[in-house]
Amino acid sequence: MTADAPAVLSLETAVYVIPTDAPEADGTLAWDKTTMLLVIARAGGEQGIGWSYTAAAAQSVVTDVLAGVVAGRSALDVAGAAEAMARAVRNIGRTGIAAMAISAVDIALWDLKARLLGCPVTSLLGRVRDDVPVYGSGGFTSYDEQQTRRQLTGWVEKDRIPRVKIKIGESWGSKERRDLERVALAREVIGPDAELFVDANGGYSTGQAVRVARLLADYGVTWFEVPVSSDDLAGLAVIRGQILPDVTAGEYSWSLADSARLIDAGAVDCLQLDVTRCGGISEFLRGAALAAASNLQVSAHCAPNLHAHVAAAVPNLRHVEYFHDHQRIEQMFFDGVLDPGGGVLTPDPAVPGLGMELRAADAERYRRG
């Protein structure tokens, strides 16, 4: 343990299940609730918080596997804890549930360290920008025209966010006509100046994605996220070579190796990273550096209030996804959430840690573990 540095005393966990405010669906999945794993790390009279949007099973990974290799370590030695956690999950697998559990703990440890040192996480990491660009994200395939109009108008007119994303690839790519009608609607609502992105969540085949992308050109779409499965590296590379919008993927990169495979395959124009899945802040920084070595930008996937600080410390950041479902939960559960007004999030340089405090009483009604 580092001299005079307090040791991590414990990792406490809670699982919350939060109903969505309306049925949500994308190209390949539908859901009506979201599960959050919350981790609280304690040391030196302070506590750090982290979370992941995952499954309840991640809680047992923290309590049964990770807590034992983190407790007792210096609260300042986050890198050592990250390495210990990665080694501890060898036999249960590094991807999926384990990666999301590790991510929640890692985030909590960075928050704790910054609070112990009395500085915001973004200053601890090394701030390169004050404001982090965001894009409004939702536009679910389950929405009707009125819901879509209301959401897009709120982002562009009320929040003044100059870039938005909607879901396409509905029903595994079987409703192309409705996909295109919804893209046309989105362009009508946001006007000619705002950027328009689409996300198929792997709903199309390779040839279908190329065909759809060419039709999207009429609407000025500049970002085509996961047109085919992110496991289909060859398909992504083929699509990237034949269409104008940037091809993006990476939200299911569970480790640095996953990000490396996307980059090495020439599969993406912009690498997506998710701090709640890739291994936390520690691995997000490494993934961003890996992308920079190939002259690629990175985009932060979902969980906007968790991404703001690390995003402000990444030179090759493009933007952060201001995802409807997650920003709603973060506003429900925490004080200190950031305002996206003007299309940016601005971490407060005067508030230590990640700058958020759990409103435990408000969250308690959703607690399931």
Annotate the PLM regions:
Residues 8, 45, 66, 105, ...:
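Conserved, mostly hydrophobic/aromatic
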